[in-house]
């Protein structure tokens, strides 16, 4: 495991703390060996609808990023995750394109880095860039294959190897660092919500090929994989050298088409992982929530309670999906089922700020009982449906 990192910045060598994963699957800081805890958001402005919508308004995308990163920082968040739209970053063979999407991603990373916000990059989505509009053809390799063929078609696998290798070693001109060498980038998730259709042997072989492509760059950062999809091959995930496993949670559903009403605290009492006591090596890989959200509600009482439950289940990285860019948040056109922005949903945003404090202070693995007893937890945290309150 990594113990330290030596990073050259502006001609000076300095030792910068990084994240490593120990033999028990725990993320730790290299300088203190203390456990790490990250809480933050997904945010998509460099890509897809958010990118286009800022263009429709004829606004400066980098200025928009500046405002949003400032607000994200004000909320006390220290984590950022994104699934890159590979269709906007690649050609048909998986070669990384030097285009505006990559430039904006590089710029965003640099701005997050300035505010000590750490990053996990999910390298590919393997789906289109349209939602909620129509897909726009780009020539990217993922448009050539069905998502459920991406992990078995020989040419698709070869394109992914090319892409992952190019992405991980890409040098960010705003930081002067390759992604693989930037201490602010905690690690890489191979893909977003994979759709496997092969045998356990084939799935394991696919993951090992992706790991080889990444590691050939000299990467020593942790690599994560989604284990909450394709449960029939879950053992294969744990038989590979991935160091982190990823999960999501939408406890009250998605895309209801209306604002939901009611007390949803009983829905989030527990986060059960059905194979936690069945799969060999489960406790040897760190656990990350790549996406979560109590969707389609405007209440302010849910976020700290969800963090409480995630910490009980052993998660060290928790990122909500998704933070709305301020310049388009007034219309909530990006993901209508999700709505979070400091200026336009201030009560939910403050709940996120309180949740960030909970993520930092609550001990991993500690239980707080069941509802309603668990509405009081940690050192003075409280949530209430009747008061619509987080504190």
Q: Locations of the language-model features?
A:
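Flexible loop/turn segments at secondary-structure boundaries
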Residues: 89, 129, 232-233, 253-254, ...
